[in-house]
Amino acid sequence: MAKAKFERTKPHVNIGTIGHVDHGKTTLTAAISKVLYDKYPDLNEARDFATIDSAPEERQRGITINISHVEYQTEKRHYAHVDAPGHADYIKNMITGAAQMDGAILVVAATDGPMAQTREHVLLARQVGVPALLVALNKSDMVEDEELLELVEMEVRELLSSQEFDGDEAPVIRTSGLKALEGDPQWVKSVEDLMDAVDEYIPDPVRDKDKPFLMPIEDVFTITGRGTVVTGRAERGTLKINSEVEIVGIRDVQKTTVTGIEMFHKQLDEAWAGENCGLLLRGLKRDDVERGQVVVEPGSITPHTNFEANVYILSKDEGGRHNPFYSNYRPQFYFRTTDVTGVITLPEGTEMVMPGDTTEMSVELIQPIAMEEGLGFAIREGGRTVGSGRVTKITK
């Protein structure tokens, strides 16, 4: 068993705990790492509760988020687990995409049932595209009435279904993070059951390599006698030489063929997700393409100008604006590699947005961008970031 540490073949899955601030997310996170350490000591490190609870401040795109990362393994998988203890931290984390989750454990205290914050977290999880949620009915040791537990479970399932998660099939496990940390066998087993459910219910993530090819263009130049080369970092997928591609965004969609792929001045047959490469494009002139467009597998993504988004506006302390903004505010929206001006419309009933606020908004860009739901962007003003958001719905 001692060799298990060096196994690199296990699927890696990013998960997190979400839910109301006082329902025991952090205690449960600590319990998971302790229970798995006791069960598989050669796969896991011992972590104490204090290191998770004192979540370090991280700065993501200049936004301060208190968040802690814990790693642990089951026999089946390697997990990275994020716990954002504060409500505001969780919201910022989800909207800015600081931690992309492949699935999440919704922690609901059996003593309280779902609260307004629980609902908000589930809604956000759907909007940013978390694929699967399962439920830890935490503090279950404190509820002796079986009927009450069943009632809370029903309520949670209805909440999941109302946000298009699978309320009927999602595992709901009764846990007690505190009792599991204390070593109570019944509740240690509840945490083991929870992780078995996570192993089974959260699907293996589709690796970026298996998605359709997409490379944002960072630079364009001409190689005399050969043609136009675009460079950038492939975001996802793979691309073979002589493949047809589309150039999407800013202007009309153009079709072309990739006749050469180069990386660090070496010729390649194929470009992979995560690699910086240059693509030689057949029949296109230097002026036909520009930074901010994307090179994609044909038909895989379309250009759009109008969308709805969830946005976090930086506070003054984070280097954001000093004063509020209103509808018709026209900042730049930075998508992947370029800024495009857009006009903001605030939702009905929202007169203005203050620095430090989270808001929904509708945006109309002056040029189309290759867009899909879940795509992140920064809002900039005079070259500095004043907000960060995600596309929740494409409207045109």
UniProtKB/Swiss-Prot annotation:
Stretches for region G5: 176-178
PANTHER family membership: ELONGATION FACTOR TU, MITOCHONDRIAL (PTHR43721:SF22), ELONGATION FACTOR TU-RELATED (PTHR43721)
Domain tr-type G: 10-206
Reaction it catalyzes: GTP + H2O = GDP + phosphate + H(+)
EC number: 3.6.5.3
Residue numbers binding Mg(2+): 26
Gene of this entry: tuf
Keyword match Nucleotide-binding: yes
GO molecular function, a single term: GTPase activity
GO cellular component, as recorded: cytosol
UniProt protein name: Elongation factor Tu
Superkingdom, taxonomy of origin: Bacteria
Keyword field: Cytoplasm, Elongation factor, GTP-binding, Hydrolase, Magnesium, Metal-binding, Nucleotide-binding, Protein biosynthesis
Annotated region (G1), positions in chain: 19-26
Family: Belongs to the TRAFAC class translation factor GTPase superfamily. Classic translation factor GTPase family. EF-Tu/EF-1A subfamily.
UniProt organism field: Micrococcus luteus (strain ATCC 4698 / DSM 20030 / JCM 1464 / CCM 169 / CCUG 5858 / IAM 1056 / NBRC 3333 / NCIMB 9278 / NCTC 2665 / VKM Ac-2230) (Micrococcus lysodeikticus)
Annotated positions binding GTP: 19-26, 83-87, 138-141
Region (G2): 62-66
Subunit structure as annotated in this protein's UniProt entry: Monomer.
Region feature (G3): 83-86
Function: GTP hydrolase that promotes the GTP-dependent binding of aminoacyl-tRNA to the A-site of ribosomes during protein biosynthesis.
Main location: cytoplasm
Localization: Cytoplasm
Region (G4), start-end ranges: 138-141
SUPFAM superfamilies named in the record: EF-Tu/eEF-1alpha/eIF2-gamma C-terminal domain, P-loop containing nucleoside triphosphate hydrolases, Translation proteins
